[in-house]
């Protein structure tokens, strides 16, 4: 807005001074006392966009303006010049010139400020580019390699722990199989023990039966002995009675010789009874001895079986105790292994959770670094856009300055030509041409996901 206002003031001042419409545009010229030309160089920036990335193009323009025409025209006038009108016009022109110098000084100050600002922004841009290059070359690769190495180490640890856990599980399964076999053997030994106890109970019943039979036989022997003693006593009493009767009847026997001999009969009877008693006693003793021998043999057999059963029972009891101790030891080992397995599972779960947290934290840091890089790239792009805008504004001010110089030089030439009413065309003026050399620099920056993928710079030279 201020630029347009200054430009309108300058145009209106020239209209007031020289009249007419807008001043024509001529190449930039400089006045000098000697007839030599001067060259003025200006830089025009052209902004073009390629692939959504702004680029900056610079046009360097060189203009050569002859200056001998004004000097020749002024010298060729001679004494015909009339300065009465020129003095009045020069006063107003000097006033306008002074105002324009003040405005040009302000423009120069603003231009210097813009140059300082551009230099500062270029320094900041260089710092940001260096920071982006440092972050691009340092952080992502090194952090990624470090994290990948740590992840590989964690995976190796997890694989080792998994193999160790598999070995522990195999050992646990083997111990469970051994424990199952021992339990099966224990059941078999318990069954054998029960069978031995049943046999022992049967043997005890046989021993009890044999003992009862022996007691019964002993009782029968005692009864037979008592019966034999009773029979002996009865026999003796009968013999005494018979002897008494024989003594009482002795006389009668003697007197009666023809009667049978009772003594011989009694002896025969006694002999018969004694033989019968002896036979019964012998049979009873033989039967008793046979029974006693049978019972003794049966008792010996039962005692041997009982001792064998007791010995087997002691062996089984020792085996049961040893198996019980072994089962208790295996149970303790199994409990310790299960406890170790639970502790290892808990530790592995905690380590896995820590590793997951570390991975999440590292991924978050990577995302943060990518966001920082994207932010730096956006800031770099914004600074580049600001720089291009400032370059465009500087080029605009330069055009305005050149336009002011051209506008100042052209009215003076017209004033001298109208006052002198003289027009001359010098060979230098006829031969002078405006040569424009344009250099186009195209800088292409390709970005992808906030990261700079490639940069390319291209220059084109054209002569107009």
From Swiss-Prot:
Coiled-coil residue spans: none
Start and end residues of each stretch annotated as Head: 2-100
Region spans: Tail: 405-464
Keyword line: Cell membrane, Coiled coil, Cytoplasm, Intermediate filament, Membrane, Muscle protein, Phosphoprotein
InterPro entries tied to this protein: IF_conserved, IF_rod_dom, Intermed_filament_DNA-bd, Intermediate_filament
Region of interest (Linker 1), residue spans: 134-143
Domain IF rod: 100-408
Cellular compartment(s): Cytoplasm, Myofibril, Sarcomere, Z line; Cytoplasm; Cell membrane, Sarcolemma
Modified residues (Phosphoserine): 7, 23
Xref: SUPFAM superfamilies: Intermediate filament protein, coiled coil region (SSF64593)
Main subcellular localisation: cytoplasm
Region (Coil 1B): 144-244
Blocked amino end (Ser): residues bearing it: 2
Example GO molecular function: structural constituent of cytoskeleton
GO biological process, one term: skeletal muscle organ development
Assembly with partners or alone: Homomer.
Similarity remark: Belongs to the intermediate filament family.
Protein name listed in UniProt: Desmin
Organism: Gallus gallus (Chicken)
